[in-house]
Amino acid sequence: MTINEKILSNKDLNISDWELDFYSRPIIEKNGKKRWELIISSSKNFETEKIFLWNKICPANEVNSIWLTKALNEALKDAERKGWAKPLKIRFWRASMKSIIKKSIENIGIEALVSRRTYELFDRIEFLEKEIYPLESGYVRGVLAPTFTSNILNDPNPLPEAVRGDALTISEISIEELKSAQNWPIEFGDIFPIQNSIKNENLVPGLRLFSKDRSLALAAWFSSLEPVKLLIKQNQLILEASEDDKWLVTDLQEKDAKELNDKFTQTKKDSCGYQFISIQSTPFVEKFAGFWILKAVSYTHLTLPTKRIV
């Protein structure tokens, strides 16, 4: 196949980054060992409406980079058969498995990115934990493999002076506006399709940053952060990012903090927890140096006493 033929062939393939988790699950196998499982999901984007999902159980005595590299190659072959191009990046967030996962991803020639911007993966894990695992023999009620929560213990670091911009505001946009984000002029950022089932008039809270002379520099820095979600803690607006980073965006008056926290809570109910960050030179330009859609993910396991189901 010539280079031009390869290019034309790739245009016919679905294109997306991948999101990955490799860890134990709340199931005890017949041999008395915890189940280990590789879970893969493609990231939602505007290139395709499809989602690639792939799972493989790993024997407890083979939890290593050799097994994972082999499994990833199997996943790539299966994805290609189903019409998917090889991903450029694979995101993962499981800190205790970082060495094995990173090595295995790099073994197959793909960039490994430690990030909690794995919203499709969180949805997939939540579905498995609620709908699939409880039906299996050996299921254990309780916490065997904690998924992501926002209870990161480290204190937030203040945003560097150079990236605070000239001004910031807390704002809201409608779901209808957010759905059209793919048509906006955006230099840096990460956006993805919004669920169609959400009412267009529902509002999404977010952070707007302005810098007349350094908006692109700010956007480039934020892009390297892998921003995950905004939250309020002790009258402070916090940005969670990357693997376990926390950034103090600004201090708020108690009244303002409560009002914004209420908006975040309401958005979780009405709009799937969507949030946004935008960076512009001024509030009046119709161009974004940076724009990110975020999602307030907070999944927890069952907290019932541990009990094996047979």
What annotation goes with each model-predicted range?
Residues 6-47:
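An active-site-proximal beta-strand-loop segment
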Residues 42-58:
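Electropositive, glycine- and tryptophan-enriched low-complexity nucleic-acid-binding patches
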Residues 65-88:
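Short, basic/hydrophobic alpha-helical segments
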Residues 88-101:
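Acidic, metal-coordinating catalytic cores used for nucleic-acid/nucleotide bond scission
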Residues 102-114:
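Short, surface-exposed basic-aromatic patches at helix termini and helix-loop junctions that form
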Residues 112-136:
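Long, charge-dense
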Residues 138-256:
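Long, charge-rich C-terminal accessory regions
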Residues 300-306:
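Conserved small/polar residues in nucleotide/adenosyl-binding loops
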